[in-house]
Protein backbone atom coordinates (compact mmCIF):
# COMPACT_ATOMS: atom_id res chain seq x y z
CA UNK A 1 0.00 0.00 0.00
CA UNK A 2 1.47 3.32 -1.09
CA UNK A 3 1.58 6.19 1.35
CA UNK A 4 0.24 9.68 0.88
CA UNK A 5 2.46 12.69 1.42
CA UNK A 6 1.34 15.67 3.50
CA UNK A 7 3.00 18.28 1.34
CA UNK A 8 1.57 21.25 3.22
CA UNK A 9 2.88 19.96 6.56
CA UNK A 10 6.39 19.61 5.13
CA UNK A 11 6.24 23.02 3.47
CA UNK A 12 5.23 24.50 6.82
CA UNK A 13 8.24 22.91 8.52
CA UNK A 14 10.54 24.20 5.78
CA UNK A 15 8.82 27.59 5.55
CA UNK A 16 8.93 27.12 1.79
CA UNK A 17 6.17 26.45 -0.74
CA UNK A 18 7.02 24.30 -3.74
CA UNK A 19 5.98 25.39 -7.21
CA UNK A 20 6.66 21.82 -8.31
CA UNK A 21 5.56 19.50 -5.46
CA UNK A 22 6.69 16.49 -7.47
CA UNK A 23 10.27 17.43 -6.56
CA UNK A 24 9.44 17.12 -2.88
CA UNK A 25 7.82 13.72 -3.35
CA UNK A 26 10.91 12.52 -5.20
CA UNK A 27 13.11 13.81 -2.37
CA UNK A 28 11.08 11.79 0.13
CA UNK A 29 11.30 8.58 -1.90
CA UNK A 30 13.97 6.23 -0.55
CA UNK A 31 15.35 3.79 -3.18
CA UNK A 32 13.89 0.87 -1.21
CA UNK A 33 10.41 2.37 -1.51
CA UNK A 34 10.71 2.63 -5.26
CA UNK A 35 11.78 -1.02 -5.39
CA UNK A 36 8.57 -2.04 -3.63
CA UNK A 37 6.35 0.40 -5.52
CA UNK A 38 7.53 0.65 -9.15
CA UNK A 39 4.86 3.28 -9.79
CA UNK A 40 7.12 5.70 -7.91
CA UNK A 41 8.80 7.25 -10.94
CA UNK A 42 12.08 8.31 -9.34
CA UNK A 43 13.91 7.96 -6.03
CA UNK A 44 15.87 10.55 -4.09
CA UNK A 45 19.44 9.60 -5.02
CA UNK A 46 20.03 12.28 -7.68
CA UNK A 47 18.55 14.96 -5.46
CA UNK A 48 20.80 13.80 -2.61
CA UNK A 49 23.80 14.36 -4.87
CA UNK A 50 22.66 17.89 -5.67
CA UNK A 51 21.64 18.67 -2.08
CA UNK A 52 25.04 17.62 -0.78
CA UNK A 53 26.65 20.27 -2.98
CA UNK A 54 24.10 22.90 -1.96
CA UNK A 55 24.68 22.18 1.72
CA UNK A 56 28.44 22.35 1.27
CA UNK A 57 28.24 25.69 -0.52
CA UNK A 58 25.92 27.31 2.03
CA UNK A 59 27.94 26.09 5.02
CA UNK A 60 31.20 27.17 3.36
CA UNK A 61 29.81 30.64 2.71
CA UNK A 62 28.45 30.87 6.27
CA UNK A 63 31.77 29.94 7.85
CA UNK A 64 33.72 32.19 5.49
CA UNK A 65 31.67 35.21 6.56
CA UNK A 66 31.42 34.22 10.23
CA UNK A 67 35.17 33.67 10.70
CA UNK A 68 37.03 36.17 8.47
CA UNK A 69 40.40 35.37 10.06
CA UNK A 70 40.13 31.57 9.94
CA UNK A 71 42.54 29.80 7.58
CA UNK A 72 41.46 27.44 4.82
CA UNK A 73 42.44 24.31 6.73
CA UNK A 74 40.29 25.01 9.78
CA UNK A 75 37.44 26.26 7.60
CA UNK A 76 37.54 22.93 5.79
CA UNK A 77 37.57 20.74 8.89
CA UNK A 78 34.89 22.83 10.59
CA UNK A 79 32.71 22.54 7.50
CA UNK A 80 33.17 18.77 7.57
CA UNK A 81 31.75 18.68 11.10
CA UNK A 82 28.68 20.61 9.97
CA UNK A 83 27.85 18.64 6.81
CA UNK A 84 28.57 15.05 7.84
CA UNK A 85 25.88 12.39 8.24
CA UNK A 86 25.50 12.93 11.97
CA UNK A 87 24.98 16.67 11.47
CA UNK A 88 22.44 16.14 8.68
CA UNK A 89 20.63 13.62 10.88
CA UNK A 90 20.33 16.28 13.58
CA UNK A 91 19.01 18.83 11.08
CA UNK A 92 16.36 16.33 9.97
CA UNK A 93 15.38 15.77 13.59
CA UNK A 94 15.16 19.50 14.31
CA UNK A 95 12.75 19.95 11.41
CA UNK A 96 10.83 16.73 12.21
CA UNK A 97 11.17 15.56 8.62
CA UNK A 98 11.96 11.91 9.27
CA UNK A 99 8.32 10.94 9.74
CA UNK A 100 7.66 11.86 6.10
CA UNK A 101 10.31 9.56 4.62
CA UNK A 102 8.90 7.04 2.15
CA UNK A 103 10.90 3.90 2.81
CA UNK A 104 10.39 0.26 1.88
CA UNK A 105 9.13 -2.17 4.49
CA UNK A 106 12.13 -4.40 3.91
CA UNK A 107 14.65 -1.64 4.55
CA UNK A 108 16.36 -2.03 7.92
CA UNK A 109 16.31 1.13 9.97
CA UNK A 110 16.35 -0.55 13.36
CA UNK A 111 20.00 0.30 13.93
CA UNK A 112 20.93 3.83 14.86
CA UNK A 113 23.51 3.93 12.06
CA UNK A 114 20.87 2.96 9.50
CA UNK A 115 18.55 5.69 10.72
CA UNK A 116 21.33 8.28 10.63
CA UNK A 117 22.14 7.41 7.02
CA UNK A 118 18.52 7.44 5.86
CA UNK A 119 17.70 10.74 7.58
CA UNK A 120 20.91 12.40 6.41
CA UNK A 121 20.16 11.41 2.82
CA UNK A 122 16.62 12.70 3.23
CA UNK A 123 17.82 16.11 4.36
CA UNK A 124 20.22 16.43 1.43
CA UNK A 125 17.55 15.33 -1.05
CA UNK A 126 15.08 17.89 0.27
CA UNK A 127 17.72 20.61 -0.07
CA UNK A 128 18.27 19.51 -3.66
CA UNK A 129 14.54 19.75 -4.31
CA UNK A 130 14.30 23.20 -2.72
CA UNK A 131 17.26 24.41 -4.77
CA UNK A 132 15.78 23.20 -8.06
CA UNK A 133 12.40 24.69 -7.22
CA UNK A 134 13.40 28.02 -5.73
CA UNK A 135 17.14 28.54 -6.05
CA UNK A 136 19.90 29.02 -3.50
CA UNK A 137 18.22 31.66 -1.34
CA UNK A 138 15.44 29.46 0.12
CA UNK A 139 17.91 26.63 0.61
CA UNK A 140 20.13 29.01 2.55
CA UNK A 141 17.15 30.14 4.64
CA UNK A 142 16.55 26.52 5.65
CA UNK A 143 20.16 25.62 6.39
CA UNK A 144 21.61 28.60 8.25
CA UNK A 145 19.12 28.65 11.17
CA UNK A 146 19.94 24.97 11.79
CA UNK A 147 23.67 25.63 12.21
CA UNK A 148 25.21 26.14 15.67
CA UNK A 149 25.94 29.69 16.75
CA UNK A 150 29.47 31.08 16.61
CA UNK A 151 30.29 30.20 20.21
CA UNK A 152 29.17 26.60 19.66
CA UNK A 153 31.10 26.23 16.41
CA UNK A 154 34.43 27.30 17.92
CA UNK A 155 34.83 24.19 20.14
CA UNK A 156 34.20 21.96 17.12
CA UNK A 157 37.54 23.09 15.74
CA UNK A 158 39.52 21.78 18.68
CA UNK A 159 37.53 18.93 20.26
CA UNK A 160 38.16 16.63 17.31
CA UNK A 161 41.75 15.31 17.38
CA UNK A 162 41.91 15.68 13.59
CA UNK A 163 41.21 19.40 13.89
CA UNK A 164 43.74 19.81 16.68
CA UNK A 165 46.40 17.95 14.71
CA UNK A 166 45.73 20.05 11.63
CA UNK A 167 46.01 23.25 13.64
CA UNK A 168 49.25 22.02 15.23
CA UNK A 169 50.93 21.04 11.95
CA UNK A 170 49.84 24.25 10.23
CA UNK A 171 51.18 26.42 13.03
CA UNK A 172 54.47 24.59 13.49
CA UNK A 173 55.27 23.16 10.04
CA UNK A 174 52.97 25.04 7.63
CA UNK A 175 51.66 21.73 6.22
CA UNK A 176 48.51 19.63 6.46
CA UNK A 177 48.43 16.01 7.66
CA UNK A 178 47.31 13.33 5.21
CA UNK A 179 45.48 10.10 5.99
CA UNK A 180 45.71 6.68 4.39
CA UNK A 181 43.01 4.08 5.10
CA UNK A 182 43.61 0.34 4.76
CA UNK A 183 41.18 -2.55 5.28
CA UNK A 184 41.49 -4.21 8.68
CA UNK A 185 39.76 -6.91 10.71
CA UNK A 186 39.37 -6.97 14.48
CA UNK A 187 40.16 -10.03 16.58
CA UNK A 188 36.58 -11.25 16.23
CA UNK A 189 36.75 -10.86 12.44
CA UNK A 190 34.66 -7.71 12.17
CA UNK A 191 35.69 -5.51 9.23
CA UNK A 192 37.15 -2.10 9.91
CA UNK A 193 39.93 0.30 9.02
CA UNK A 194 43.61 0.75 9.76
CA UNK A 195 44.34 4.44 9.25
CA UNK A 196 47.81 5.98 9.10
CA UNK A 197 48.40 9.72 9.37
CA UNK A 198 51.42 11.26 7.65
CA UNK A 199 53.02 14.69 8.03
CA UNK A 200 55.64 15.70 5.47
CA UNK A 201 55.70 12.08 4.34
CA UNK A 202 56.52 10.77 7.83
CA UNK A 203 54.21 8.39 9.69
CA UNK A 204 52.99 10.20 12.82
CA UNK A 205 50.25 7.93 14.09
CA UNK A 206 47.96 4.96 13.49
CA UNK A 207 44.43 4.05 14.46
CA UNK A 208 42.29 0.92 14.24
CA UNK A 209 38.48 1.01 14.42
CA UNK A 210 35.28 -0.24 12.85
CA UNK A 211 34.66 3.06 11.06
CA UNK A 212 37.14 5.06 9.04
CA UNK A 213 36.14 8.25 10.84
CA UNK A 214 36.91 6.79 14.27
CA UNK A 215 40.18 5.25 13.06
CA UNK A 216 41.25 8.66 11.73
CA UNK A 217 40.51 10.24 15.11
CA UNK A 218 42.58 7.60 16.90
CA UNK A 219 45.47 8.07 14.48
CA UNK A 220 45.37 11.84 14.99
CA UNK A 221 45.23 11.38 18.76
CA UNK A 222 48.32 9.17 18.67
CA UNK A 223 50.12 11.71 16.48
CA UNK A 224 49.30 14.49 18.93
CA UNK A 225 50.43 12.48 21.94
CA UNK A 226 53.76 11.78 20.24
CA UNK A 227 54.53 15.16 18.70
CA UNK A 228 52.62 17.84 20.61
CA UNK A 229 53.88 18.18 24.16
CA UNK A 230 50.78 20.14 25.10
CA UNK A 231 48.54 17.08 24.59
UniProtKB/Swiss-Prot annotation:
Q: Which residues bind Mg(2+)?
A: 48, 121, 124
What are its GO biological-process terms?
mRNA processing; regulation of gene expression; rRNA processing; tRNA processing
Q: Name the coenzymes or cofactors required.
A: Mg(2+)
Residues forming the catalytic site: 52, 124
Q: Which Pfam families match?
A: dsrm, Ribonucleas_3_3
Per UniProt, which keywords does this protein have?
Cytoplasm, Endonuclease, Hydrolase, Magnesium, Metal-binding, mRNA processing, Nuclease, RNA-binding, rRNA processing, rRNA-binding, tRNA processing
- Broadest EC class? hydrolase
GO CC terms of this entry: cytoplasm
Tell me the ranges covered by the DRBM domain, including all copies. Answer: 160-229
At the top level of its lineage, which domain of life is listed? Answer: Bacteria
The protein's location, in the record's own words, is: Cytoplasm
One GO MF term on file is: rRNA binding
Q: Which family does it belong to?
A: Belongs to the ribonuclease III family.
Reported function: Digests double-stranded RNA. Involved in the processing of primary rRNA transcript to yield the immediate precursors to the large and small rRNAs (23S and 16S). Processes some mRNAs, and tRNAs when they are encoded in the rRNA operon. Processes pre-crRNA and tracrRNA of type II CRISPR loci if present in the organism.
Please name the NCBIfam families in this protein's record: RNaseIII (TIGR02191)
- Official protein name in the record: Ribonuclease 3
Gene (name only): rnc
Amino acid sequence: MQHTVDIQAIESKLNFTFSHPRLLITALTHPSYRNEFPSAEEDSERLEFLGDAVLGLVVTEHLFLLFPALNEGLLSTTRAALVNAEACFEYTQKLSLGEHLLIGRGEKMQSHRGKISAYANLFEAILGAVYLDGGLSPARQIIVPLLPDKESILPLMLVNPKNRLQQFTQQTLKVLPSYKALPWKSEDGSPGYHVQVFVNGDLWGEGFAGSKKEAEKLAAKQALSTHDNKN
